[in-house]
Amino acid sequence: MGMKKSRPRRGSLAFSPRKRAKKLVPKIRSWPADKKVGLQAFPVYKAGTTHALLIENNPKSPNNGQEVFTPVTVLETPDVTVAGIRLYEKTTKGLQALTEVWAEQLDGDLGRKLTLVKKEEKKTADALDAVLEKATEVRAIVHTNPKTTGIPKKKPEVVEIRIGGSSVAERLAYAKEILGKTLAISDVFEAGEIIDTLAITKGKGFQGSVKRWGIKVQFGKHQRKGVGRHTGSIGPWRPRRVMWTVPLPGQMGFHQRTEYNKRILKLGSEGAEITPKGGFLNYGAVKNGYVVVKGTVQGPAKRLVVLRGSVRAAEDKFGLPEVAYISTESKQGN
């Protein structure tokens, strides 16, 4: 007979405190060490999920060469606009902003999100060259264009994206080229690439201990009293306080989460070819370009998802599998 296992909870304490995210736009706290010149992330909108048939390309798999059913996620990728450039220097207190430059022509809808810089107060590109020696990082300030999608909103999301490159001067030269222009998903990623997805998960509201932490339901006398779905003990008499490790009811969902090493199966420019009959549930038709990612992606439909170059990519042994079929049948349940 083995030792009795203790299981006070199923959820990890590493994610505590489990509270609502402050913003719908996820924070990007780390970047890939990539010397390729270009943006290292791209914001998209989640349309929905479907399934695909892939040709298994793992020679050691019993299904090698055969069609394999795989769930996939479709993300709409409207072009983003580069509104500004910001330079950072590395200090003992972390990265500190040196200066920033905004494009001459800014979208009027951007004023719904932030206060636009007046024309006479805008800095020129010379301000960037003046602090180039101090700069250690170059980032682009981009905003989405949700009005081109089926999402009923005009206010764009603003995301700060790091520009990769072998040197700061090379990154800054690229930043000057794209300032004020629009970029497509094909300018950043390509089919077969391994990426990470960052997004705010689907919110569940205030939930009890059983659903939130997976604790055991108490049967017998407790259940007959109507208290079977509560934490049996929340701690000893002393210390006279409730420890933060106790599984208690509270907010569940609407947290920022990062999923690593997702594969891009397909990029496309015509949304009609991927939209299922009747449109995606709670989303509708894809009107812009799209990207198909293998597996699931966190968050509900219409949620902003940031695709980032992989920071933990392992060796890609098998490469991009052949996509034999992507389902566009109705998701309406008919």
From Swiss-Prot:
Cellular component GO terms, alphabetical: cytosolic large ribosomal subunit
Keyword Transmembrane helix attached: no
Segments of skewed composition (Basic residues): 1-10
Keywords in alphabetical order: Ribonucleoprotein, Ribosomal protein, RNA-binding, rRNA-binding
Source organism, top-level taxon: Archaea
SUPFAM superfamilies linked: Translation proteins (SSF50447)
Pfam family of the protein (one): Ribosomal_L3
Gene3D superfamilies, sorted: 3.30.1430.10, Ribosomal protein L3, domain 3, Translation factors
Coiled-coil parts of chain: none
Annotated stretches, region: Disordered: 1-20
Cross-referenced InterPro entries: L3_arc_euk, Ribosomal_L3_dom_3_arc_sf, Ribosomal_uL3, Ribosomal_uL3_arc, Ribosomal_uL3_CS, Transl_B-barrel_sf
Functional description taken from the UniProt entry: One of the primary rRNA binding proteins, it binds directly near the 3'-end of the 23S rRNA, where it nucleates assembly of the 50S subunit.
Subunit-structure text: Part of the 50S ribosomal subunit. Forms a cluster with proteins L14 and L24e.
HAMAP family linked to this entry: Ribosomal_uL3_A
Family: Belongs to the universal ribosomal protein uL3 family.
Protein name (record): Large ribosomal subunit protein uL3
Originating species: Methanococcus maripaludis (strain C6 / ATCC BAA-1332)
